[in-house]
From Swiss-Prot:
The gene is Nsmce1. It is found in: Nucleus; Chromosome, Telomere. It comes from Rattus norvegicus. GO terms for molecular function: protein dimerization activity; ubiquitin protein ligase activity; ubiquitin-protein transferase activity; zinc ion binding. This is Non-structural maintenance of chromosomes element 1 homolog. Belongs to the NSE1 family. GO terms for cellular component: chromosome, centromeric region; chromosome, telomeric region; mitotic spindle pole; nucleus; Smc5-Smc6 complex. Its EC number is 2.3.2.27. GO terms for biological process: DNA damage response; double-strand break repair via homologous recombination.
Length: 266
């Protein structure tokens, strides 16, 4: 079997198809990545034993290393869902988006990024972003056009929109963390628990330390009276639930069952 005789660091058609499809999507949640992996095995090597996802991705990364590309794993800041993105390590700046967006569109993203990083909440309002349209480099852009470009950023999973405000998608954080740290050293916020870049989260009202929502959920998971890990003062915020992939999977199965039932009834 190809799966059992393959040497480490060599890509098969299974790996190549997986990589090609991941490149098409840009970023996927972990359950989607597992489904994609199984699909690629069924298409190219039906009889092989499916590698553990971590080993499978490590194998691809060992080949991509010389190209300065890597499949990186992260989590969504709002609810802790594991995600995977194909990251270009050769350039950390906004310029890595240049193949999909025009110069003035990239500059709009930079303006939005700066507002998001500078904000206390990790969000920038569409009004504040659109007010900077006159300052864009390159071809002039009307506000109506800028609104459409912001939606393109959302569709491409660079930004997330919630009630007229924008924040960074997990894909943007995975791809641009180094660039953000270097470009906005005075505005950058770090999580006190995982020590990685924090865009949105909770903060201690006494000492000011910040924590990602998923880190808050895990840290205070079995604590009746949550206290700040730094100053030990009372933690005044609501504690979010820890993301449970099994519960999510069951909800997905239930949802698809209801959908198929509705389809049969029509």
């Amino acid at each position: 079997m190809q799966g059992s005789t393959r040497r480490a660091g060599a890509m098969t058609d299974v790996h190549r198809r997986f990589l090609q499809l991941l490149m098409t999507h840009g970023v996927l949640e972990e359950w989607e990545v597992r489904r994609l992996q199984n699909h690629c095995y069924k298409v190219h090597d039906r009889n092989a034993t499916v590698d553990k996802l971590e080993d499978f991705i490590n194998n691809i990364n060992s080949v991509l290393e010389s190209l300065y590309i890597e499949i990186k794993k992260g989590i969504t800041e709002d609810d802790g869902r594991p995600i995977y993105a194909l990251v270009n390590l050769a350039t950390t700046s906004v310029s890595k988006m240049a193949t999909d967006f025009a110069e003035n569109e990239l500059d709009l993203f930079r303006k939005a990024l700066e507002l998001i990083v500078d904000s206390e909440t990790g969000f920038a309002s569409s009004t504040n972003i659109l007010n900077l349209v006159d300052q864009l480099k390159g071809k002039k852009m009307r506000k109506k056009e800028a609104e459409q470009v912001l939606q393109k950023f959302v569709q491409s999973k660079w930004l997330i929109e919630k009630e007229g405000e924008f924040t960074l998608h997990g894909r943007a954080i995975l791809e641009m963390e180094q660039f953000i740290r270097e470009s906005y050293p005075d505005a950058v916020k770090m999580c006190n628990i995982c020590h990685s870049l924090l865009i949105q989260g909770q903060s201690c009202e006494t000492c000011g330390i910040r924590m990602h929502l998923p880190c808050v959920a895990k840290y205070f998971q079995s604590t009746a009276e949550p206290r700040c890990p730094h100053c030990n003062d009372y933690w005044p915020h609501d504690i979010p639930e820890v993301f449970d992939p099994e519960k999510e999977r069951e909800a997905g199965i239930s949802k698809s069952s209801r959908k198929s039932l509705r389809t049969r009834q029509h």
